[in-house]
Amino acid sequence: MHQADQDFNYWWNTSGPWVEEPNVRRSGTSGVQRVMHNGTTVYVKRQTGHLFRSLKYPFGRPTVLREGKALSKLQELGVAAPQPIFYSAKKIDGVWQGLLVTKDLNGFQDLDTWYDNGGQARLSEHEHLQLLERLATLLAKMHLGRWQHGCMRSKHVFMKERNTAAGIEVELALLDLEKSHGRATTLRAARHDIPQLRRHSYWSVAEWRTFLACYEKVLGQPLGSDVHANVQPRRRALS
């Protein structure tokens, strides 16, 4: 048996508590388990018959291969995201099985949960503006590499607080990159992700102006007046 097959079989047969229970998506199944490996926590995504289709792959290609490639590309661009340890796919009796193994982002949580749990109240106004500027810089760096997230929502941005002598600082990372792929130009990537993020985030118009000003400064070009048009912020659900 080749080493690649041995590695695939090893990861396929690991087990641990479910982080995402197996569910049916894209006419296939997908689930994620938290697994201990050599004393560290990793996340193992297993998929069966879970494919995406494109002009290049009209008959379908395992989604984990696109996501693994995206994570590797973000590493190359210096954009924080889970580090891929292993990803591969193979056909068993005519059905694709796919694997993606990533390192744990220890201490991170998604932005929506952080806001809903009162995270913003722990920051000064200046610190919160810094959070928006850090996110703007992170996304601009990805788009300058002509790469788009593809499903840009605030819940797919993960953050971690750090107490420093100067106050609270935040680290940011991007997750859920199943739809992520390269684009022909920076602007195409930007004009896909940024309006999508606007529709699926809670920030006020004023906060978005701060975000966009920083984003366009790093990007080095404007996105267009339509992106700057005021959009009603998504409302938080009442508890």
Predicted regions located by residue number:
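Hydrophobic residue at the +6 position relative to the catalytic HRD Asp in the kinase catalytic loop
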Residues: 152-164
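Conserved ATP-binding subdomain of kinase catalytic cores across diverse folds
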Residues: 11-111, 140, 144-145
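N-terminal presequences and immediately downstream first alpha-helices
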Residues: 1-13
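Alpha-helix N-cap and loop-to-helix initiation/capping positions
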Residues: 59-62, 127, 138, 189
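Conserved kinase catalytic-core helix
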Residues: 73, 77-80, 108, 114-155
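Short, solvent-exposed loop/turn segments that connect beta-strands within catalytic domains
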Residues: 92-96, 162-170
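Active-site beta-strand-loop-beta-strand hairpin of nuclease catalytic cores
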Residues: 37-41, 165-172
